[in-house]
Amino acid sequence: MYLPVGRIVAGGLIFLLFASRAAAIDLIIDDEQSLRDAASTTTFAMMTYYHGNETGQIPGAFPSKWWEGSALFLALLHYWHFTGDTTYNNELRVGLEWQSGKNGDYMPSNYSSYLGNDDQMFWGLAAMTAAELKFGDGVFNTQIKRWDTTACNGGMRWQIWPYQSGYTLKNSISNGGLFQLAARLARYTNEPIYATWANKIWNWSLSSPLLNSSTWNVADSTNMGDNCATQGNTQWSYNYGTYMMGAAYMYSYTNGSAQWLTAVDGLMNKLFEEFFPSSNGGIFEEVTCEPSEQCNNNEVLFKGLVSTWLSFTALLVPSTYDKILPKLQTSAVAAAKSCTGHNNNTCGVRWYQSQYDGWIGMEEQISATDLFVANMIRFTGNSTGPVTATTGGNSTSNPTAGENDTSTASIPVSAITTGDRAGAGILTVLFTAGWFGLMGFTVLGG
């Protein structure tokens, strides 16, 4: 969020909380300890916004933006895994457990009435990541029950309930996120059912206006009102990132299939072309909203998520490593220079400016943390890649988790109007939540 109007007071509070920190992040990109220090600084700042570990508060809860909790916990998981710092692991464990809900499907009753498929998915990805990184299943099962064939020959709607603006849209983050989840479950469990679903979602996406395997354009959404004949082609980095990440997992699952290597390369190159523009020195930019300074909190998180997915892609598909790491490094150096706000390492949004730009918030700190941690792959290598159930993972799949969920909304509704879309705003950010539930959420009991 941009500071000058609504966040000045918040900025003052954050200043008081960690004003003793250094006024700048002096990042030496080739130095492992320097990267650790940078990540530690931004993680500390990020956690000043988290109150779920305080008396009377709900662990893992962000009442006005529930899905963003999954982004914070994903950042904490990666931070712990790549740096070895366990400072926040208790908050991480308790928060993930608390928000999983009574069915282990990340649809807690406090929020289930307004969740989107993408919201739930992001929490699932957090749980999946916990399993893959050996930290300590119901989302997948609930989501595939919502595979909708009433229009467009399949696909996931953006929203779950008919009264939600967005119910008649099918979008890339919901479908690409479920694809990613299925691919990761296939690799982790080696169970064919997940690979079958990954291929099904991928092929449907290719048959729709969302994903083009000739140009590798990824559109944001398509409308059921015209049977998905047209697209909303607003460009967001996380739409590319989620399909790329899923393709990388399928590449690993299939032991190097040429089909999936082509997909990874195509999506990665298009991502670089669109969001790492040479006019900005090849620094990561959310091009739809940053130039106009109109990014909302969701959109501020996209670059952090994609930075993480790029780092995992580099580990899963080794031929991409030498292309991905320089992009991450260049962006990290610039981002560190943006973390000079308010004399307390407050990070900005427009990293390409290489100076603080006046933005302040939890989301800015999460994205910077994700980027710094992503650069740790240079020093940790393949030894820190995601494990499977047979290579060190201790989570077990629960094929019936989430079966009690009844949120398969099939009530006919009228098409969404242009005004409805404007009110809905940008598609809700994160695609990763849904996967964790299906893993039986073994992080709960070890």
Description of each model-found segment:
Residues 139-169:
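Asp-box/WD-like beta-propeller blade repeats and closely related beta-sheet repeat scaffolds
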Residues 25-75, 79-122, 130-133, 167-170, ...:
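CBM-like carbohydrate-recognition segments
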Residues 99-102, 136-151, 194-208, 264:
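An active-site-proximal structural segment forming one wall of the substrate-binding cleft
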Residues 173-189, 193-250, 264, 268-272:
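Active-site cradle of extracellular carbohydrate-active enzymes
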Residues 76, 83, 127, 134, ...:
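Long alpha-helical scaffolds in large eukaryotic adaptor/regulatory proteins
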Residues 222-226, 232, 259, 278-291:
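Membrane-interfacial loop- and helix-cap regions that link adjacent transmembrane helices
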